[in-house]
Amino acid sequence: MKTLALLTAAFAALIVGSAAAAIRPPAIRYVDDKFGPVLATPKKQALYYWTAENDFRIHCKGSCAKLWPPLVVRSRAAVPTRVAGIKGTFGTIKRPDGRLQVTFNRRPVYTYVHEAPTQVLCDNVGGWFVVKLR
């Protein structure tokens, strides 16, 4: 069984006109028994980066993106630059289809379609690496 250590983080409210809406983090930290702290979606899907994208551009498209779904958001405002308890910065990059993909330390991040929550199956496979938070 994976040891889960979810960070509790209070996020500032985003003021839109006179209404306030809480910003949900695009990613959390959880502790995997084998890899230690890794970056994951709020549903505990491990997040990966691909070394072919060392130029900070999107290269995983089409069939690649079906196997490695990108973590996307509706707007840049949905992504805080920093998340409590996670060293590094978040941002977004525009995908070729126009959607905004979440980045971590300027690298686009992805899940792996064949993994269940809390699984890490593809670290160091074909240039894909789980985002380790050490």
Please place each PLM-identified region on the residue numbering.
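Positively charged n-region of N-terminal signal peptides that target proteins for export
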Residues: M1-A5
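Bacterial N-terminal signal peptides
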Residues: L7-I15
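Hydrophobic membrane-targeting alpha-helices
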Residues: V16-A20
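Compact beta-sheet-dominated domain cores in extracellular/mature segments
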Residues: A21-R134
